[in-house]
């Protein structure tokens, strides 16, 4: 479940009609303490950069800019599509994009379909305040 699912879940709770063309799923049963089903995939965003989580995999698209900042914190800027198995590699140290290209291409296609024109390779780093 993701925060964008609050809309459909709360809509169900109050008996509202939720449009079918929005990305929100009804998880009211989960809110009420019953076991629910998680999303299989989701697009995540941090400081204007997107990534895609599907099952055990994380797909990080290429972005322009420095790989790390002055404190050596990685910024998610790579010059190629990267794929990680989060179940086996939580630190995202082993890029599997060349090892399992069929998974990379499938997730890349799903990511691009989900994000449409929102994915841009040239994102300026936002200053955290």
Task: Describe each model-derived feature in a short phrase.
Residues 111-125:
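Bilobed periplasmic-binding protein-like "clamshell/Venus-flytrap" ligand-binding domains
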Residues 89:
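Intrinsically disordered, low-complexity polar regions and short flexible loop motifs
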Residues 97-104, 108:
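C-terminal structured subdomain/cap of oxidoreductase catalytic cores
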Residues 92-96:
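Carboxylate-dense, calcium-coordinating segments in secreted/extracellular and ER-lumen proteins
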Residues 2-82, 86, 120-121:
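C-terminal cap/loop subdomain of S1 sulfatases and analogous C-terminal strand-loop tails that border
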Residues 31-32, 126-129:
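Amphipathic alpha-helical surface "interface" segments used
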């Amino acid at each position: 479940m993701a925060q964008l699912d609050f809309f459909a879940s709360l809509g169900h709770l109050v008996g509202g009609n939720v449009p079918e063309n929005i990305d929100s799923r009804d998880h009211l049963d989960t809110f009420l303490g019953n076991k629910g089903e998680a999303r299989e995939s989701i697009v995540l965003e941090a400081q204007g950069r997107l990534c895609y989580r599907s099952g055990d995999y994380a797909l990080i698209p290429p972005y322009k800019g420095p790989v790390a900042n002055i404190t050596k914190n990685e910024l998610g800027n790579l010059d190629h599509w990267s794929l990680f198995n989060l179940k086996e590699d939580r630190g995202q140290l082993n890029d599997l994009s060349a090892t399992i290209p069929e998974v990379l291409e499938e997730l890349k296609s799903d990511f691009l379909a989900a994000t449409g024109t929102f994915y841009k390779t040239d994102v300026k780093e936002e200053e955290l305040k």
